[in-house]
Amino acid sequence: MAKISKFQDKQVEAILNDMIAVLEKHQAPVDLSLVVLGNMVTHLLNSSVGSQQRIVLAKVFSDALMNSVKNSK
């Protein structure tokens, strides 16, 4: 999603590949995959981000997602 990141591409790709493998293992269709990923994002925000920053971070995340989808080829 992000073009500039503080994380190494290798690390991001490794985690992404693991997550894709899990969804494929469960033969999750797109709608179920999106529900699961959305629940994961919600869990991360609620369990790891202070209440003052949750809405701000959720907005930044959703904006980045929208930009990624708009700019995909």
Swiss-Prot record:
It comes from the Bacteria. Transmembrane segments: none annotated. Gene3D superfamilies: YejL-like (1.10.3390.10). Belongs to the UPF0352 family. This is UPF0352 protein HSM_0097. It comes from Histophilus somni (strain 2336).
